[in-house]
Structures are given as C-alpha cells and as structure tokens.
C-alpha cells in the first residue's frame, strides 16, 4: 500500500483552487488562508492515510508474514499487538476527523466515500474478489483520488455545491486514479513472486509478463485527462512544469522499468513520490504568481 506521501493531490487541488479564487475581484481569499487550509488538508490526509495503513496491515498480517518484503512489519512480525494497533488507528482517525471538521466548516459528508473505500480495500485482495474481477488497486486508487474534492472544498466549499466541486475536480480525480494504479502496480510488482505463491488478488499478478505494456496503457489516460484539468487555469507555468515534466518523467520511468527485475518497480514508485512533491511546489508557485497579479 502506498505511503502517506501519496496524499499530495489534496494539496494540489487546494492550492490551485486558491490560485483560481485569487483572481476574483470581490471576497478573494488571502494567500495565508489558502496556505492554512492546504496545510489542514495535508495533515488530515496524512493522519487518515496512517490509519488506513494500520487497517490494511491489520487485515493482511497473515499474508504479510509470508512475504519477504513485509514479514518484518510490526503486526506481521508480532512486535505490535492487534489491540495496540487498533488504539493507534482510532487515534489517527479521530484526529483526522477533527481537522476535517474545522477545515470543511462542518461539511464532513465529503469524506464518507473515502472512509468506506478504505475499509473495503484490504478485503479485495482475497480470491473471492478475484472471481468478481474486482482488484484492490481500483479501491486504493479511489481512496487516493477522492481527497482532491475535500481539497477544493476547503477553499471553495462555502460558495460551491457538492456537485460543482466534483465537476471541477473530476479530471484531476481521474488523473490521480490512474496514476495511483500505475505507481501501485509498479510498487507491488516487487512482491510478485511471493504473491503468486499465496494467490493474492492483484492487478500485477493478472498482467504477468505484460506488466510493462499495462504500465504504458495506464499512462495514457493520465496524459489525456491532465490537460482537461489544467485548461481551466489558463497558466503557461502549469503546462510547462506539470504537464511537461510529468510527460518526460513517465517516458524515463517506462524506459527504465524491467519486468524481469521486480525491484525496478520500487525505483519507479520512488520516482513518482518525487513527482508528487514537485507538483506541490509547482502549485505553490502558481498560487504566488496569481496572488501577485491580483495585488
């Protein structure tokens, strides 16, 4: 399961919503308000993702104990009891919900879908889900993509309906959905040998020797939907530093990935971590540029 760092899209969404709002002639939010809300978004996502990781490791502890890369995880190795894990998970959920309640001005309904999806995710690795052609990457991608909506709502929620917020965020959610499947397929491919022995239901197990082609196919909707999102901001900066850099990065990643070397999936995942942080910087600069113009 991806690390907490993969919750960067909520920051992208909040920062660019703020950049767009600063162009308003009346009642435009201040850059400090936008940055504060963005920090709340990141903190809430970080805490909730931490809780989700504990939940995932709790349900998967028997599987993880039989996989070389994961057998030393706290729950799988027995270093942490299930009771201790539950308390830590509950504390993170409570803290995350408290931050979200303040950030969204009480509109907590925005986070219900991602809570349900996070609870279901680990169960989709079981053979039963495989029979229904449901793979855990679908649910994981949804849980990573959805926070773009609370991210925008943190800035525009008082003036937009839920439907309007979803409409603005849909292209970004689609980008992040396929991006998550892309990087998770590569990341999880490191365990392909052990997971096949355990009959773990996962996308990369189905892809088999065609994993490289699957990764190429997953990049296509990312690069197709990203322009749909960036068009609304009318920013040359975003086109060059986001669209341009992502396109070049994907080309390099796909060239270096080797299906015969499962460890190369880890390198691809790390590269996308850097890409996510880079995009936060890009969106922050866009906010500053728009704020300077509006002064």
Curated annotation (Swiss-Prot):
Its main location: membrane. InterPro entries: Prenyltransferase, UbiA_prenyltransferase, UbiA_prenylTrfase_CS, UbiA_sf. Its EC number is 2.5.1.-. It is a multi-pass membrane protein. Pathway: Secondary metabolite biosynthesis; terpenoid biosynthesis. GO terms for molecular function: transferase activity, transferring alkyl or aryl (other than methyl) groups. Its cofactor is Mg(2+). Keywords: Membrane, Transferase, Transmembrane, Transmembrane helix. Diterpenoid pyrones display various biological activities and subglutinol A shows insecticidal and anti-HIV activities. It is an enzyme of class 2 (transferase). It comes from the Eukaryota. The chain crosses the membrane at residues 39-59, 84-104, 109-124, 131-151, 168-188, 213-233, 237-257, 271-291. The keyword Transferase applies. One of its GO terms (biological process) is terpenoid biosynthetic process. It is found in: Membrane. GO terms for cellular component: plasma membrane. Belongs to the UbiA prenyltransferase family. Polyprenyl transferase; part of the gene cluster that mediates the biosynthesis of the diterpenoid pyrones subglutinols A and B. The first step of the pathway is the synthesis of the alpha-pyrone moiety by the polyketide synthase dpmaA via condensation of one acetyl-CoA starter unit with 3 malonyl-CoA units and 2 methylations. The alpha-pyrone is then combined with geranylgeranyl pyrophosphate (GGPP) formed by the GGPP synthase dpmaD through the action of the prenyltransferase dpmaC to yield a linear alpha-pyrone diterpenoid. This is Polyprenyl transferase dpmaC. It comes from Metarhizium anisopliae. The gene is dpasC.
């Amino acid at each position: 399961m991806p690390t907490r760092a993969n919750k960067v899209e909520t920051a992208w969404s909040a920062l660019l919503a703020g950049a767009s709002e600063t162009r308003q002639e009346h009642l435009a939010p201040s850059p400090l308000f936008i940055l504060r809300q963005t920090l709340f978004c990141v903190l809430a996502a970080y805490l909730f993702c931490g809780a989700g990781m504990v939940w995932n490791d709790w349900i998967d502890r028997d599987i993880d104990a039989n996989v070389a890369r994961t057998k030393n995880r706290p729950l799988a190795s027995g270093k942490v009891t299930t009771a201790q894990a539950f308390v830590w998970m509950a504390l993170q959920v409570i803290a995350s919900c408290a931050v979200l309640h303040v950030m969204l001005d009480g509109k907590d309904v925005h986070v219900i879908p991602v809570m349900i999806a996070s609870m279901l995710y680990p169960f989709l690795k079981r053979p039963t889900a495989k029979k229904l052609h449901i793979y855990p990457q679908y649910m994981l991608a949804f849980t990573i993509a959805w926070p773009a909506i609370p991210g925008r709502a943190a800035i525009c929620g008082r003036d937009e309906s839920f439907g309007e917020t979803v409409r603005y965020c849909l292209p970004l959610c689609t980008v992040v959905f396929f991006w998550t499947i892309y990087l998770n397929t590569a990341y999880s491919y490191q365990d392909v040998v052990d997971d096949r022995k355990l009959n773990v239901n996962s996308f990369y197990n189905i892809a088999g020797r065609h994993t490289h082609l699957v990764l190429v196919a997953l990049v296509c909707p990312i690069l197709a939907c990203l322009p749909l999102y960036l068009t609304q901001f009318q920013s040359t900066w975003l086109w060059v530093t986001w669209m341009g850099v992502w396109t070049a990065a994907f080309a390099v990643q796909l060239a270096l990935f080797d299906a015969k070397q499962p460890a190369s999936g880890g390198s691809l995942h790390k590269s996308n971590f850097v890409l996510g942080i880079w995009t936060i910087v890009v969106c922050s600069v866009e906010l500053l540029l728009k704020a300077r113009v509006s002064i």
